[in-house]
């Protein structure tokens, strides 16, 4: 009965424009889904047996690197962090200062982890390089809009947090293209093992640009942040990204019911 009520509520919310169709997605069967990271910073991915020693691009560091650190430690991977936010860059410096040391305290609730919570005893500094740029469709100088809550760390290029306004408080940052990063790290367009996108709305333009250019990571973890503020514009933008991925041969194999999704490229 509970399941029937949930399905009815989901249908009703979609009819009222409160819920996107993707938010009914859960785990597809037949995949080796793994979860790494804190309660706040966790991501789900498919362990397909090819991740040992791989390279990951992780856009949107913030102040919770739990997924990135755990992934780098578990797979001996290089996790390229991409974030120009001042607080994120400061957090990265704190992490590097503790490389080689184990965790001293448990993860805290929320998205601001102390560096002492990370198990860095199996990490080399070369595994966690930081690119201090905003991931975008071109390399330029852009407005990076502040969150509506000053306590939050995440800035946005599209400013969905402030109703897509162009005149709210912002800083200016340099942006970069994913194709330039692939060249810098010597990775072919179809050889990136995993891409994580937590970039506050800019994922729509970035994903469309990637698909247009034939850039095909094996799997993509993406947060469609705009689903946190449901409206027609947000739903249309998420539809654009989902359609671009589907047309390029990706399948959504996991959703957490709110904003986080995992897309896997067809073999």
Task: Describe the predicted segments one by one.
Residues 1-267:
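Phosphate/nucleotide-binding beta-alpha loop and adjacent structural elements of enzyme active sites
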């Amino acid at each position: 009965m509970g399941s029937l009520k949930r399905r009815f509520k989901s249908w009703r919310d979609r009819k009222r424009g409160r819920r996107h169709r993707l938010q009914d997605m859960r785990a597809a069967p037949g995949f080796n889904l793994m979860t790494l990271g804190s309660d706040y910073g966790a991501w789900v991915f498919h362990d397909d047996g090819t991740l040992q020693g791989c390279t990951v691009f992780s856009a949107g560091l913030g102040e919770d690197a739990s997924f990135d650190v755990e992934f780098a430690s578990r797979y001996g991977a290089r996790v390229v962090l991409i974030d120009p936010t001042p607080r994120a860059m400061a957090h990265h410096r704190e992490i590097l200062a503790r490389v080689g040391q184990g965790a001293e305290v448990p993860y805290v609730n929320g998205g601001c982890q102390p560096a002492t919570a990370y198990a860095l005893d199996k990490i080399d500094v070369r595994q966690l390089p930081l690119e201090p740029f905003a991931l975008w469709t071109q390399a330029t100088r852009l407005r990076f809009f502040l969150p509506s809550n000053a306590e939050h760390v995440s800035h946005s290029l599209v400013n969905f947090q402030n109703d897509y306004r162009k005149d709210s408080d912002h800083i200016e940052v340099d942006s970069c293209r994913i194709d330039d990063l692939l060249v810098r790290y010597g990775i072919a367009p179809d050889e990136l093992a995993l891409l994580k996108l937590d970039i506050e709305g800019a994922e729509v333009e970035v994903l469309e640009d990637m698909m247009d250019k034939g850039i095909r990571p094996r799997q993509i973890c993406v947060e469609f942040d705009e689903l946190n503020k449901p409206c027609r514009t947000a739903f249309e933008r998420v539809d654009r990204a989902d359609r671009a991925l589907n047309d390029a041969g990706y399948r959504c194999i996991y959703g957490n019911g709110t904003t986080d999704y995992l897309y896997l490229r067809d073999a």
